[in-house]
């Protein structure tokens, strides 16, 4: 197009070339006309200038050319002169320049000193030359590349290399020569000498600090010790700005050092402004990399990572009890637990795995997503991962005393001696784990998870905990009811494990609860932990079944002494018998267990004092009672026990009841009514609420767990249940008879159990007032606690408050009798400690599943953390206040010094177990 246009133009303007026209336009009209006339004859001029109106133009002006040589600006001459002098290694000063100009340009007038100075300053501003103490130097293409980065000191940019002016003379760039950076030039030195002086001094200072060449001082490289840390920081901030702007700050070098302070302050301000968003550390030294690696710029690379120190501090704030020592203890404990778990699994895992896997599957089905997804929680109630022997590792809280986290399964061994089931505390296990009281599983937990859940369930193992964590929130959100049920199951399992003896952990409360809820679900789900009271689980199932058939009846799982044939429950109780020998949950389920289980749970809830104690504790305790009380239960006339149990015995409950472990079913019939009178308003309709009942049981079990010997609680519960139950169905005399029969065997267990039951009753009475923070953590748990209270109230209303009070008194009397008769073989201290541990673990489990897992309201992570911390603090304070609660105490006193020792825990229990007074009672018993 340009060519066409040009040709067109030429056609349009034949009188002139396109190039001529371009220049002509820049000339005056007169000149243009003059040239036109000059080139073309006058005749053609008008035609030639079609585009111009010549009529009004000025007539051509005669111009005389002036002869003169080519003009060269003084600046260029000075540059040439400076370059030549630099090449000649001559110092370039103003005087030397004048001489050089005079010599080299003889015909040219020499500029005055003022003009020369001004021109030099202009050249410096234009960055054509730069002043140095040794004179001016021409700026060459290599100057800015070779010169070291500027150092800004005292708001002045100094060239480190200028310190050595000879080297910095790059006018004729010498190889290896470091020319002062252009900044020198930028800073126009009106008086180069003054500038040199000021600069030189500064440079000397800088130079003294370090070698000029080695220290490549870029704005960000302000590693110069000469630069104070603030300066060091400032240059980085201003590095970009300064590098850009320094060329314009020609005057800065001339500024005296007086401005250094101001410049530093200014630089700091700029630095702060520029790095407001970043965490700025003032570093004395910089590496070549500007934001030094030391700077905690976590936002960019790994925004999620929290420094270990910060993380630990957060953890400490959340859980003050969490210390390195505790963590170490916990780690060691976890290792031991895993080893024991492996050994135990070798011993009895094959049988237990089959039954437990079935049970766990059923339990998962019943619980749905949350439980099935969080295997760790499943393992609590029904170890899905394997036998309950494995559960201690999976769920230490359930099976371990809260203090020691020792798997209670391992803690207690039940012996079948004659007609009595004797529970021995596995001192080795306890001792090995007793010192370990970590409340926190740091074994494999992520720090983040640790922060979220300061009290993870250590027994589950890191993998389980991780699974639980990953699924727990989602699943908890999905099914809070399930989760709360499971949480209560956990607390129950912990309570049960505590309740029976702490060894009663044999039947994880969940297992027991599962037994109850799973009575409907799966048969042959009874589990026996080799060293634990897994048979107690069957007993629990029996009791659950008993309560299911007629929670009133079930509440007093009396063992029919007549039928001593080890029923499934008996088999469960029998240490030697494999889980297969235990009555399958199906058998138990075949009993009116659904209803009984619901009733059982409801009994626990409604008659938290008596029934609840028997139910939660009753499961395990009855297991224990069945174990320790097996004798007494067996002593009970089979007819007495069977009569009450007949309703739930139908499905092999009688078999269980004939045996000590099966004693739970013993007076269930009569007692069930009694319980119904007081609090055991049957919740038969609550089969779906079996989980809720289980939750209730958990809460109550938690209350009962603390009862030092859940066995005694079970015995006491059995007796007390008998008493209570006697009101509705069986005559109180019959129940007391049973209770008395049980008392000899249950004496020990019941002795402890009675205080527990009393506390359970008391807590049952106070249940509404008390609230289990752990169970409450789940809204469902709190609701369940309220429901339990309501159920208890309903039951009480059904029976009448007076009747309930009478029942409570009877229970207390039975408890006292049991306390007198209490001859629990397992050290009471161990039981107490086990129960305490179980209670604590139950709380932690309940908290873990309920309060910690849930993300809203009470279940918010922060709330859960605070609850966990509060619980831990409460537990610890209670332990300190109540030596009986301390692991060292180990329940030295009767487990049922709970009243005395359990009262501090009662506060704790109240907090932990406010939803259910039963929980409170168990904590109190702890």
From Swiss-Prot:
<feature type="region of interest" description="Disordered">
    <location>
        <begin position="452"/>
        <end position="529"/>
    </location>
</feature>
<feature type="region of interest" description="Disordered">
    <location>
        <begin position="338"/>
        <end position="391"/>
    </location>
</feature>
<feature type="region of interest" description="Disordered">
    <location>
        <begin position="825"/>
        <end position="926"/>
    </location>
</feature>
<dbReference type="GO" id="GO:0005634">
    <property type="term" value="C:nucleus"/>
</dbReference>
<feature type="compositionally biased region" description="Basic and acidic residues">
    <location>
        <begin position="473"/>
        <end position="495"/>
    </location>
</feature>
<feature type="compositionally biased region" description="Polar residues">
    <location>
        <begin position="746"/>
        <end position="769"/>
    </location>
</feature>
<dbReference type="GO" id="GO:0005737">
    <property type="term" value="C:cytoplasm"/>
</dbReference>
<dbReference type="Pfam" id="PF10264">
    <property type="entry name" value="Stork_head"/>
</dbReference>
<feature type="compositionally biased region" description="Polar residues">
    <location>
        <begin position="914"/>
        <end position="926"/>
    </location>
</feature>
<dbReference type="GO" id="GO:0003700">
    <property type="term" value="F:DNA-binding transcription factor activity"/>
</dbReference>
<dbReference type="InterPro" id="IPR019391">
    <property type="entry name" value="Storkhead-box_winged-helix"/>
</dbReference>
<feature type="compositionally biased region" description="Polar residues">
    <location>
        <begin position="518"/>
        <end position="529"/>
    </location>
</feature>
<feature type="compositionally biased region" description="Polar residues">
    <location>
        <begin position="847"/>
        <end position="884"/>
    </location>
</feature>
<feature type="region of interest" description="Disordered">
    <location>
        <begin position="632"/>
        <end position="672"/>
    </location>
</feature>
<dbReference type="GO" id="GO:0009617">
    <property type="term" value="P:response to bacterium"/>
</dbReference>
<feature type="region of interest" description="Disordered">
    <location>
        <begin position="724"/>
        <end position="803"/>
    </location>
</feature>
<feature type="compositionally biased region" description="Basic and acidic residues">
    <location>
        <begin position="632"/>
        <end position="658"/>
    </location>
</feature>
<protein>
    <recommendedName>
        <fullName>Storkhead-box protein 2</fullName>
    </recommendedName>
</protein>
<feature type="compositionally biased region" description="Basic and acidic residues">
    <location>
        <begin position="785"/>
        <end position="799"/>
    </location>
</feature>
<dbReference type="GO" id="GO:0000977">
    <property type="term" value="F:RNA polymerase II transcription regulatory region sequence-specific DNA binding"/>
</dbReference>
<feature type="region of interest" description="Disordered">
    <location>
        <begin position="1"/>
        <end position="32"/>
    </location>
</feature>
<dbReference type="GO" id="GO:0001893">
    <property type="term" value="P:maternal placenta development"/>
</dbReference>
<feature type="compositionally biased region" description="Basic residues">
    <location>
        <begin position="463"/>
        <end position="472"/>
    </location>
</feature>
<dbReference type="InterPro" id="IPR040126">
    <property type="entry name" value="STOX1/2"/>
</dbReference>
<feature type="region of interest" description="Disordered">
    <location>
        <begin position="564"/>
        <end position="588"/>
    </location>
</feature>
<dbReference type="GO" id="GO:0009792">
    <property type="term" value="P:embryo development ending in birth or egg hatching"/>
</dbReference>
<feature type="compositionally biased region" description="Basic and acidic residues">
    <location>
        <begin position="18"/>
        <end position="32"/>
    </location>
</feature>
<feature type="compositionally biased region" description="Basic residues">
    <location>
        <begin position="353"/>
        <end position="378"/>
    </location>
</feature>
<dbReference type="GO" id="GO:0006357">
    <property type="term" value="P:regulation of transcription by RNA polymerase II"/>
</dbReference>
<feature type="compositionally biased region" description="Basic and acidic residues">
    <location>
        <begin position="379"/>
        <end position="391"/>
    </location>
</feature>
């Amino acid at each position: 197009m340009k060519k066409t246009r040009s040709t067109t133009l030429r056609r349009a303007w034949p009188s002139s070339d396109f190039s001529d026209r371009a220049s002509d336009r820049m000339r005056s009209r007169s000149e243009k006309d003059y040239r036109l006339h000059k080139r073309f004859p006058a005749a053609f001029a008008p035609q030639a200038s079609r585009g111009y109106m010549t009529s009004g133009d000025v007539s051509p002006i005669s111009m005389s050319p002036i002869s003169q040589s080519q003009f060269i600006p003084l600046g260029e001459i000075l540059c040439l002169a400076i370059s030549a002098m630099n090449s000649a290694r001559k110092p370039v000063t103003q005087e030397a320049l004048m001489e050089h100009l005079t010599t080299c340009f003889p015909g040219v007038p020499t500029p005055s000193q003022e003009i020369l100075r001004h021109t030099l300053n202009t050249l410096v501003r234009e960055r054509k030359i730069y002043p140095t103490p040794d004179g001016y130097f021409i700026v060459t293409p290599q100057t800015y590349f070779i010169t070291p980065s500027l150092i800004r000191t005292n708001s002045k940019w100094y060239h480190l290399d200028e310190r050595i002016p000879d080297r910095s003379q790059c006018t004729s760039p010498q190889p290896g020569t470091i020319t002062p950076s252009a900044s020198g030039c930028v800073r126009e030195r009106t008086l180069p000498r003054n500038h040199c002086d000021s600069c030189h001094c500064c440079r000397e200072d800088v130079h003294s600090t370090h070698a000029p060449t080695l220290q490549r001082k870029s704005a960000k490289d302000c590693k110069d010790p000469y630069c104070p840390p603030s300066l060091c920081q400032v240059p980085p901030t201003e590095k970009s700005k300064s590098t850009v702007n320094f060329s314009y700050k020609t005057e800065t070098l001339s500024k005296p050092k007086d401005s250094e302070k101001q410049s530093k302050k200014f630089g700091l301000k700029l630095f702060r402004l520029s790095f407001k968003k970043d965490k700025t550390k003032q570093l004395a030294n910089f590496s070549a990399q500007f934001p030094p690696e030391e700077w905690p710029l976590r936002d960019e690379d790994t925004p999620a990572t929290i420094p270990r120190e910060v993380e630990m501090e957060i953890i400490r704030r959340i859980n003050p009890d969490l210390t390195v020592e505790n963590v170490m203890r916990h780690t060691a404990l976890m290792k031991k637990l895993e080893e024991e778990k492996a050994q135990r699994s070798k011993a009895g895992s094959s049988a237990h795995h089959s039954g437990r896997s079935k049970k766990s599957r059923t339990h998962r089905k019943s619980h749905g997503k949350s439980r099935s997804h969080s295997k760790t929680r499943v393992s609590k109630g029904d170890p899905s991962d394997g036998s309950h022997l494995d559960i201690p590792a999976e769920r230490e809280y359930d099976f371990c005393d809260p203090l020691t986290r020792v798997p209670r399964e391992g803690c207690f061994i039940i012996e079948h001696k004659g007609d009595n089931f004797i529970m021995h505390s596995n001192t080795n296990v306890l001792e090995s784990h007793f010192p370990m009281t970590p409340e926190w599983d740091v074994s494999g937990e992520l720090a983040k998870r640790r922060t979220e859940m300061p009290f993870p369930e250590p027994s589950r193992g890191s993998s389980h905990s991780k699974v639980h964590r990953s699924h727990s929130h989602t699943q908890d959100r999905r099914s809070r009811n399930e989760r709360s049920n499971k949480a209560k199951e956990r607390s129950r399992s912990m309570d049960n494990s505590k309740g029976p003896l702490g060894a009663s952990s044999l039947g994880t409360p969940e297992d027991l609860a599962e037994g109850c809820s799973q009575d409907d679900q799966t048969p042959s789900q009874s589990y026996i932990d080799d060293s634990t009271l897994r048979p107690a689980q069957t007993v629990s199932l029996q009791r659950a079944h008993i309560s299911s058939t007629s929670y009133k009846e079930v509440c007093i799982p009396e063992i029919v002494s007549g039928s001593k044939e080890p029923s499934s429950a008996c088999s469960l109780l029998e240490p030697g018998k494999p889980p297969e020998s235990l009555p399958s949950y199906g058998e138990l389920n075949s009993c009116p267990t659904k209803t009984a289980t619901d009733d059982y749970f409801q009994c626990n809830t409604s008659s938290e004092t008596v029934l609840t104690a028997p139910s939660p504790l009753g499961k395990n305790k009855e297991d224990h009672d069945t174990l320790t009380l097996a004798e007494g239960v067996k002593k009970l006339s089979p007819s007495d026990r069977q009569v009450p149990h007949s309703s739930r015995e139908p499905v092999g409950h009688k078999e269980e009841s004939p045996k000590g472990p099966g004693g739970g079913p013993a007076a269930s019939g009569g007692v069930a009514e009694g319980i119904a009178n007081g609090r055991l308003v049957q919740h038969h309709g609550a089969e779906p609420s079996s989980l809720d009942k289980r939750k209730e049981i958990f809460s109550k079990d938690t209350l009962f767990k603390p009862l030092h010997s859940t066995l005694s609680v079970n015995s006491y519960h059995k007796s007390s249940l008998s008493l209570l139950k006697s009101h509705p169905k069986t005559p109180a005399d019959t129940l007391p008879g049973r209770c008395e029969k049980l008392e000899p065997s249950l004496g020990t267990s019941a002795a402890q159990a009675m205080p527990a039951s009393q506390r359970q009753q008391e807590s049952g009475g106070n249940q509404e007032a008390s609230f289990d923070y752990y169970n409450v953590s789940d809204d469902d748990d709190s609701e369940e606690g309220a429901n339990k209270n309501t159920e208890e109230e309903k039951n009480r209303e059904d029976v009448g408050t007076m009747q309930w009070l009478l029942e409570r008194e009877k229970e207390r009397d039975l408890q006292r009798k049991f306390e007198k008769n209490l001859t629990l073989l397992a050290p009471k201290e161990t039981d107490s400690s086990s129960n305490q541990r179980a209670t604590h673990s139950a709380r932690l489990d309940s908290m873990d599943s309920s309060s910690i897992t849930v993300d809203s309201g009470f279940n918010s992570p922060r709330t859960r953390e605070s609850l966990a911390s509060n619980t831990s603090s409460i537990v610890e304070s209670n332990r300190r206040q109540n030596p009986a609660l301390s692991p060292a105490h180990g329940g030295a006193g009767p487990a049922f010094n709970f009243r005395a020792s359990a009262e501090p825990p009662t506060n704790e229990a109240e907090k932990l177990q406010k939803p259910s007074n039963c929980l409170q009672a168990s904590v109190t018993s702890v």
